[in-house]
Curated annotation (Swiss-Prot):
GO molecular function: calcium ion binding; integrin binding; SH3 domain binding; zinc ion binding
Domain CHORD: 5-64, 149-208
Biased composition (Acidic residues): 320-347
Protein name, as recorded: Integrin beta-1-binding protein 2
Record remark: domains: The tail domain binds to the cytoplasmic domain of both integrin beta-1a and beta-1d isoforms. The presence of Ca(2+) ions does not prevent binding of a fragment consisting of the second cysteine rich repeat and the tail domain but prevents the binding of the full-length protein.
Sites where the protein binds Zn(2+) 1: 5, 10, 24, 64
Gene Ontology CC terms: Z disc
Organism whose genome encodes this protein: Homo sapiens
Protein's job: May play a role during maturation and/or organization of muscles cells.
Motif (SH2-binding): 158-161, 234-237
GO process terms (BP): centrosome duplication; muscle organ development; signal transduction
Positions bound to Zn(2+) 4: 171, 186-187, 203
Length: 347
């Protein structure tokens, strides 16, 4: 008769007749989850990946046990500072917007790159991805020689890495066509000839775009402890070579490239203040976790500052109005001669 072992970290089936004192390799301790790290109280190994945590090999040998283990009793006696920090509930009242405004740094500090930590599981996934690629595929497949810059108004052609050193002069706006006139929304030069319209020099200088990256609508959320905020972006196989996360004490800028050249980008003004030097990023096969250490312990009412959320909401309304105007075209906003005559007769 085969029974299921209930020891933590084992989960194997065993025969009671052959159950020896050293048949089971398990964890006698309890799971610990603290500051995005996961592990067992009985051994020192820690990981940020939950699947790696489940696969941590047991640290103690003993017999298999088919009975469900009782819940571990709470330790008696004085608790250590670390255990208090782990068990301390988030019972701090969120600070008001006025308090946050007074305490926020007055000057905008420059953004700093946060260190990237690559999990072992992601390293293995990237190695397997490289093995599965056809010969000649890889980074060179993302940018091919002879590729044209995709920015409107720029006619540069990719010849190699040195092409990135040349400036890109382009139009950041959208083309407009109204009553035979052609122009760009970012500059006011109008022309009748389509060839002259295409030949208009760009009005902004930036970096070349050799291949449009697909914007990824990734699911993302956040959670917090008393001393930490963790922003999680979900996506398959983040590519470390193309990823960066920058932060200041009050801002967070995220640029994550996943497999398939899909890109997640976000800019946030944070609710509270963080310690940039102690913050970091963890890359895993199915997600990216951004761990932000709070400058002061306490609870955040939300991830982003209310002023930033209000500004985004207003920008969303403006964008929606712009899209409606572009759908209706500019003709709806102009008067024809017949309409002017009808208006005059009506008066």
């Amino acid at each position: 008769m085969s029974l299921l072992c209930r020891n933590k970290g084992c989960g194997q089936h065993f025969d009671p007749n052959t159950n020896l004192p050293d048949s089971c390799c398990h964890h006698p301790g309890v799971p610990i989850f603290h500051d995005a790290l996961k592990g067992w109280s009985c051994c020192r190994k820690r990981t940020v990946d939950f699947s790696e945590f489940l696969n941590i090999k047991g640290c103690t040998m003993g017999p298999h046990c088919a009975e469900k283990l009782p819940e571990a009793p709470q330790p008696e006696g004085p608790a250590t500072s670390s255990s208090l920090q782990e068990q301390k509930p988030l019972n701090v009242i969120p600070k008001s917007a006025e308090t946050l405004r007074r305490e926020r740094p007055k000057s905008e500090l420059p953004l700093k790159l946060l260190p990237l930590n690559i999990s072992q599981a992601l390293e293995m996934a990237l190695e397997q991805k490289e093995l599965d690629q056809e010969p000649g595929a890889g980074l060179d497949s993302l940018i091919r020689t002879g590729s044209s810059c995709q920015n409107p108004g720029c006619d540069a052609v990719y010849q190699g890495p040195e092409s990135d050193a040349t400036p890109c002069t382009y139009h950041p706006g959208a083309p407009r066509f109204h009553e035979g006139m052609k122009s760009w929304s970012c500059c006011g030069i109008q022309t009748l000839d389509f060839g002259a319209f295409l030949a208009q020099p760009g009005c902004r200088v930036g970096r070349h775009d050799w291949g449009k990256q697909l914007p990824a609508s990734c699911r993302h959320d956040w959670h917090q402890t008393d001393s930490l905020v963790v922003v999680t972006v979900y996506g398959q196989i983040p590519l470390p070579a193309f990823n960066w996360v920058k932060a200041s004490q009050t801002e967070l800028h995220v640029h994550i490239v996943f497999d398939g050249n899909r890109v997640f980008q976000a800019q946030m003004k944070l609710w509270g203040v963080i310690n940039v030097e102690q913050s970091s990023v963890f890359l895993m096969p199915s997600r990216v976790e951004i761990s932000l250490v709070k400058a002061d312990p306490g609870s955040w009412a939300q991830l982003e500052h209310p002023d930033a959320l209000a500004k985004k909401a207003r920008a969303g309304v403006v964008l929606e109005m712009d899209e409606e105007e572009s759908d209706d075209s500019d003709d709806d906003l102009s008067w024809t001669e017949e309409e002017e005559e009808e208006e005059a007769m009506g008066e």
